[in-house]
């Protein structure tokens, strides 16, 4: 077992421990206390800005963001596809299995801040945190993140992930569990990224094109987010992540 696999297993085990702790009464009370404290900060931030930031964790947005790394790294390409396909089933499966309700289903509406709509479905793990840290881990494992920037980027991704608490969509533990699970997957699948196979690469390409087309379509028609404001500016996320690639290719010409 190499170092990446060991770290992956440790982080995955941490996620499982957090899931178990999530059922203890003292942890539930602490989770609620921290939620109320962090969530109250959201009331002092512009709702449009909060919505814009929190949707950077949307899977469709991150698929668009992955286009540039995919363009430059075959390893990242293999990792993001394999991790995403497994991650979809893992994240959704845990939500159904654990069936822990969101804050909106438990906390009185007048006791916390929420960016509409009020979400009340399954809470654990946070899909946005899962997707953010899966994407970040793919960048790390594929060698696209310099060590000097690792801590800074971890902090930035955590800020984005915890906006889910600020908008009233998730408990703090949901974020930690989602981030741990998402970060562990590419580490556990790292060996797949080093295997060169024309058949696998062709399949990966097909899956990536399908997922990318779905993401682009839903963002362009304004149907990728639960938030109306995000749906109105889906084009902006596309512009942010695809314009650098267009610029670099124009420079080459």
Name each model-derived stretch.
Residues 28-29, 71-153:
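Membrane-interface loops
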Residues 113-251:
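Membrane-embedded catalytic cores of phosphoryl/pyrophosphoryl-handling enzymes
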Residues 63-67, 187-189:
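Canonical alpha-helical transmembrane segments
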Residues 1-61, 93-118, 252:
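N-terminal transmembrane-helix/juxtamembrane module of multi-pass inner/ER membrane proteins
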Residues 2, 43-46, 67-75, 79, ...:
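Juxtamembrane/transmembrane-helix boundary motifs in multi-pass membrane proteins
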Residues 36-47, 51-52, 81-84, 179, ...:
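Loop-to-helix transition at the N-terminal end of transmembrane alpha-helices
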Residues 12, 60-63, 80, 84-88, ...:
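Alpha-helical transmembrane spans of integral membrane proteins, capturing the lipid-embedded, hydrophobic core
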Residues 7-19, 83-87, 154-158, 208-214:
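Alpha-helical transmembrane segments
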């Amino acid at each position: 077992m190499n170092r990446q696999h060991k770290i992956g297993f440790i982080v995955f085990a941490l996620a499982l421990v957090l899931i178990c702790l999530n059922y203890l009464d003292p942890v539930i009370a602490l989770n609620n206390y921290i939620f109320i404290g962090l969530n109250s900060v959201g009331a002092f931030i512009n709702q449009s800005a909060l919505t814009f930031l929190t949707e950077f964790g949307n899977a469709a947005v991150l698929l668009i963001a992955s286009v540039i790394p995919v363009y430059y790294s075959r390893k990242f390409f293999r990792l993001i596809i394999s991790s995403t396909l497994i991650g979809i089933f893992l994240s959704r499966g845990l939500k159904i299995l654990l069936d822990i309700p969101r804050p909106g289903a438990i906390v009185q509406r007048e006791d916390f801040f929420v960016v509409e709509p009020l979400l009340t479905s399954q809470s654990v793990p946070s899909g946005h945190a899962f997707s953010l840290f899966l994407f970040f881990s793919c960048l790390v494992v594929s060698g696209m993140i310099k060590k000097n920037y690792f801590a800074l980027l971890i902090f930035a991704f955590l800020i984005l992930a915890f906006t889910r608490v600020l908008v009233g969509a998730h408990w703090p533990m949901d974020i930690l569990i989602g981030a741990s699970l998402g970060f562990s997957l590419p580490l556990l699948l790292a060996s797949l990224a080093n295997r060169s196979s024309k058949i696998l690469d062709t399949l990966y390409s097909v899956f990536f094109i399908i997922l990318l087309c779905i993401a682009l379509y839903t963002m362009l028609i304004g149907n990728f987010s639960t938030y109306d404001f995000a749906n109105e500016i889906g084009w902006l996320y596309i512009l942010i992540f695809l314009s650098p690639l267009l610029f670099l290719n124009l420079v080459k010409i």
